[in-house]
């Protein structure tokens, strides 16, 4: 059995935490927007473990793809913060009307989640399956939590 690098284990754990937090956010969003406004900003604390994970990858001379996917994740967190807290852009309410804001957001969302599935998958198939299942749950809760667009 091959020993896994600390950065790979850390990345897998970060992916699990990210998915669980997003699933929780989507579930809260459906029922209690006030609570989401109060507690949703704690999601941004994932910046710190992501930065530590980047350091671990560099320290271990790890796979550069981890750094790329971590950078995409950090970019996603940045755009999420800018849209929701800095500029207060309500692009989620009508993403067809606000497509210029939605496209980069969704691109980074899917790219970072792709990384959280594919990188653990290449390390350990069980890890990959766990991450894929969490991502599917994330997508389902995301779709169900957002209002339907009225034409």
Q: Predicted segments — roles?
A:
Residues 23-25, 83-87, 111-121, 133-150:
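Membrane-water interface at the C-terminal end of transmembrane alpha helices
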Residues 1-2, 22-27, 49-58:
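Membrane-embedded alpha-helical segments in integral membrane proteins
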Residues 71-84, 94-117, 127-137:
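Hydrophobic alpha-helical membrane segments
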Residues 51-61, 105-123:
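Hydrophobic alpha-helical transmembrane segments in multi-pass integral membrane proteins
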Residues 37-67:
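Membrane-helix boundary elements
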Residues 6-32, 135:
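N-terminal signal-anchor/start-transfer transmembrane helix
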Residues 33-36, 60-61, 85-97, 143-151:
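A cytosolic-side transmembrane-helix exit/cap motif
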Residues 35-46, 70, 93-102:
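Cytoplasmic-side transmembrane-helix entry/capping segments in multi-pass membrane proteins
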